[in-house]
């Protein structure tokens, strides 16, 4: 069903509701068409998932017979979790005739017992597996062999791919690399939001995926293109959003896609011409809705960690967190304590490091923190 609001904050519908990224899309299409896997790196909420789905949409337009798969492994905690998610995403999706699908699954997946159910509308089998820890590696190999046996060209996107480095099992990277490297009909997009970890995985000569992909790092959508997209959709609804007001929104959040999109979604929903007063009202509404969540989140951190978080938020971006001027300006503790606090905030992704310095990961949380007193 066509969205009521053109400014989507989750999911993907069609190119009509997707802004720009023409160069990045072209890069992905060219790589996949020519048999190259892609390592797609972007901060969370910059739009990498939408870009993947847009690229898959375009691929299906050009080659209707291909099969695309998308799995987000952010919540997986082990190889077993990964295998079960991979199985439920892939198994049964390569054949249009249910009986043929069942036959092929049983032919390849022998290390565990698949459980089949059927979609009431399409008849396509849905498969879940219960795999014993001792069989996880074999089951993963069988699923990949099942993909490789298809006469169809397949494209698989694995989002938050760096999560496999957190699994307790050793050697998952090497295992996966060894299973996929000789597939002739399957290509992968490995997408991730932890930039340093992803770069280490794909550019270090010591890692299994070294030089096995074409790297692609994305940043904000071009401001002019985004402005045309936004003002155009308001205009189609007989509403006015001036380029100056859009620019103020874009610059406030430095083009970070989800936050810009979230605010535009609110403004469009008000069904009024947009002025700066309405923008301020929308921001107040959003921060009010998140305020309890943010306050509750801070309860898990020490006073020193919270104080550092607020200090970074007040500055916006801090080049040297351990600099004496910064520590004294916000009456922080000793440099060693600040260093330990920073490490904790980085690990929990409340703060992230850019080329310019340290920033609050959640732009709305940063704004909420700036409104809080010390």
Describe the predicted segments one by one.
Residues 42-46, 50-155, 336:
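P-loop NTPase nucleotide-binding core
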Residues 195-213:
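Short regulatory helix/loop adjacent to the ATP-binding pocket of P-loop NTPases
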Residues 126-194, 203:
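Conserved Walker B catalytic segment
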């Amino acid at each position: 069903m066509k969205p009521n609001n053109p400014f989507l904050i989750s999911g993907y519908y069609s190119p009509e509701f997707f802004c720009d990224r023409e160069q990045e899309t072209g890069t992905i299409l060219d790589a996949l068409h020519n048999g190259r896997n892609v390592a797609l790196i972007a901060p969370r909420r910059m739009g990498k998932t939408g870009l993947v789905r847009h690229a898959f949409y375009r691929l299906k337009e050009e080659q209707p017979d291909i099969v695309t798969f998308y799995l987000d492994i952010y919540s997986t905690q082990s190889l077993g979790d990964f295998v079960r998610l991979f199985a439920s995403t892939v198994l049964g999706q390569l054949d249009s005739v249910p009986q043929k699908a069942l036959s092929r699954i049983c032919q390849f997946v022998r290390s565990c017992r698949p459980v089949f159910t059927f979609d009431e509308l399409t008849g396509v089998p849905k498969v879940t597996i219960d795999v014993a820890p001792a069989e996880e590696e074999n089951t993963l190999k069988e699923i990949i062999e099942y993909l490789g046996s298809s006469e169809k060209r397949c494209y698989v996107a694995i989002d938050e791919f760096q999560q496999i480095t957190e699994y307790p099992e050793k050697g998952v990277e090497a295992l996966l690399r060894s299973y996929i490297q000789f597939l002739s009909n399957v290509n992968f997009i490995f997408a991730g939001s932890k930039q340093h970890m992803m770069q280490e995985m794909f550019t270090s000569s010591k890692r299994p995926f070294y030089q096995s992909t074409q790297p692609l790092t994305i940043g904000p959508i071009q401001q002019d293109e985004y402005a045309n997209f936004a003002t155009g959709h308001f205009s189609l609804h007989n509403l006015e959003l001036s380029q100056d007001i859009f620019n103020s929104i874009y610059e406030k959040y430095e083009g970070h896609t989800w936050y810009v999109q979230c605010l535009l979604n609110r403004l469009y929903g008000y069904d009024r011409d947009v002025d700066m007063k309405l923008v301020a009202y929308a921001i107040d509404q959003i921060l009010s809705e998140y305020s309890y969540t943010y306050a509750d989140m801070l309860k898990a951190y020490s006073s020193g960690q919270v104080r550092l978080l607020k200090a970074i938020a007040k500055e916006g971006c801090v080049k040297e967190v351990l600099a004496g001027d910064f520590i004294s300006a916000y009456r922080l503790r000793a440099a060693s304590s600040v260093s330990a606090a920073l490490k904790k905030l980085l690990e929990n992704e409340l703060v992230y490091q850019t080329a310019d310095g340290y920033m609050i990961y959640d732009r709305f949380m940063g704004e909420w923190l700036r409104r809080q007193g010390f």
